[in-house]
Amino acid sequence: MRVFVAGASGAIGEPLIAELLKRGHSVVGMTTNEARARNLERQGAEACILNVFDAEAVEAALSKASAEGVIDELTSLPKELRDMPKYAAADRKLRIEGGGNLLRAAIACGARRYLQQSSGFFLKSAKATLADESSPLDVNASPGVSASAQTYTELEARLFGCNAIEGVSLRYGFFYGPKTWYYPGEAAANMVTKQQNPVVGNGEGVSSFVHVEDAAVGTVAALSAEPGVYNLVDDDPSPQAVWLPAFARFLGAPEPLHISEAEAREMAGEDAVYCATQLSGASNAKAKRLLGWNPRRLVWLKA
């Protein structure tokens, strides 16, 4: 299949391009500068330097690419986790406005299928249950989580409200692996090493992770599977009180500190408390069944 990948230089970009090429697809990777374009070409993809906010340029690029499938991995995320609030507005604009241009161009140029990045970590399910693909995003969570969930909700509504193209929403877990926050030497790992990421309260908030290489495999499988929503998360949704100490041991870091919800709220805000105590984990049963997908176990739980 001829595939156009937007956001080809993000965390999932390199493994996604590699997996597409491995499976025999012809790939055009969209990026924003010459250096990143050269990296894509070294991987074996065609490169397209594009401002996704320029609707005419986006349509011209899609027309030239003659893509059957379009994969939207557009994000604007910071290197440091503490900078997330500063990036939130730009990230939303990129996904809503830039992604809107991409979707309209894909339809105008006759693409058959559109794959959209979504969230498998801000879902809402009943306590002690895992969210499935029918579960909503938690738009009534803490302020930052709620805003992010609202963005993903709008993206999914836009995609599935359109009958002119086959839509697939990929609800990824928290990415880990090379070039992610959870890779040794990167933001989340550094915070754990410095004991700056404590277990909060009971630590019952359940996080779902996925290795970027497994996310890439699932994404490519979704190009030819039944349209719809897929949770691309691993087999180990885990409470903060379990995964965080395990991650510290994996890194060779000191045991995480333990603080109360009130202390966390004062130090880091409502989002930190919500993520540590109220997140819902997600089930990957549908993806395993329909995509033939078999993600690795969460690495640091095995360490």
Annotate the PLM regions:
Residues 2, 15-18, 216-272:
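Mid/C-terminal beta-alpha module of Rossmann-like enzyme folds, strongest
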Residues 32-97, 101:
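NAD(P)H-binding glycine-rich loop region in Rossmannoid oxidoreductase-like domains
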Residues 50, 254, 271-303:
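C-terminal amphipathic/interface module of NAD(P)-dependent oxidoreductases
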Residues 79, 83-145:
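Conserved Rossmann-fold NAD(P)-dependent oxidoreductase catalytic core, especially the SDR/UDP-sugar
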Residues 118-119, 154-178:
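Conserved beta-loop-beta element that borders a ligand/cofactor-binding pocket
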Residues 143-148, 173-181, 202-210:
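Glycine-rich "substrate-gating" loop/helix at the edge of Rossmann-like oxidoreductase active sites
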Residues 188-198, 202-238:
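Alpha-helical substrate-binding/gating segment
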